[in-house]
Structures are given as structure tokens and as C-alpha cells.
UniProtKB/Swiss-Prot annotation:
The lineage of its organism: Eukaryota, Viridiplantae, Streptophyta, Embryophyta, Tracheophyta. One of its GO terms (molecular function) is structural constituent of ribosome. It comes from the Eukaryota. Belongs to the universal ribosomal protein uL22 family. It comes from Arabidopsis thaliana. GO terms for biological process: translation. This is Large ribosomal subunit protein uL22y. Residues 153-175 are annotated as: Disordered. Keywords: Ribonucleoprotein, Ribosomal protein. Gene3D superfamilies: Ribosomal protein L22/L17. PROSITE patterns: RIBOSOMAL_L22. GO terms for cellular component: cytosolic large ribosomal subunit; cytosolic ribosome; mitochondrion; nucleolus; plasmodesma; vacuole. Residues 153-163 have a biased composition (Basic and acidic residues).
Amino acid sequence: MVKYSQEPDNQTKSCKARGSDLRVHFKNTRETAHAIRKLPLIKAKRYLEDVIAHKQAIPFTRFCRGVGRTAQAKNRHSNGQGRWPAKSAQFVLDLLKNAESNAEVKGLDVDALFISHIQVNQAAKQRRRTYRAHGRINPYMSNPCHIELILSEKEEPVKKEPETQLAAKSKKSAA
């Protein structure tokens, strides 16, 4: 049993999925995860499919030095800097589909699910080498990552009492 950094509030109304040591760039995956945080499952899947098709961009907010600007990233809590990290989007989309099938097995309502928690952590770097002039060797590192996510059902808010009854009670206490 693997440990998640956060446990869901209601275990019966949520499901989890996790990927470890995924060979995909950490920085791109972090921005992708940040873009779909708190979205409903259906919207998140559609958004990631649009990113893969280059119809919508992922706004880059933290790891954005040298990232070009695009109109697709405007008005998404960024100054217009964005990219289309297709490989990261595909990995996160596969995890969302895995979590969705876990929800179906649990008997949850798939249409009511939203991403309550998604987190990307750095994994151990993988080392390769590249050969340079004059017999030198430089490192050629990759930056894989771990991804974990939790889908939860939207909880129905408690119904508020009608105002007419509240007003009647307050008048009686004042008189």
C-alpha cells in the first residue's frame, strides 16, 4: 500500500490513482496538474485532449522563464505565457482515466466527480552521458516525476431554512 500525501475527507465518495517514476518532464507536468486542479473530471479530460490537439494551452506560472506567450493562455491566471506539453497531458489523462475506472468499480457517480487533489513530485534523476570534444563527457539527465490524484464526488450543500420562518422567529423574540 502506497502512502498518499493527503487522504480524502470521505473515503467512500472518492477514488485515487498514482503513477511513480514516470518518464515525463517534471516542470511541464507540474504546470499541467496545476491547470486542471479542482476541475470536474469531464472538463479536465476535455481540456487535456484539447491541449494534445493544440486547441488550448497550459498556462505556465512557476516554471515560465523563456516560455513564449500565446493568446490561448491569456485570462487563465497567467500573463499569456503558455505551452502545449502533449506528453505530460497524455500521462495525466491516462491517470484520470485510471481513476475514473476505479470510481466505476467503487460504484461512484462519474458525472459528479471532480479533482480534489493532484500533486506532482520530483523522482530520482536518471543519468545518461553525452560525449563532447577533446574526450570529455557531460551528464545527460532526465527529470522524471511521481503523480498522485484524488477524485471526489461533489457533496450536496445543506439546505438553508426559508427566510420567512427565520424572520417570524426573530419578531417573536423581539416582542
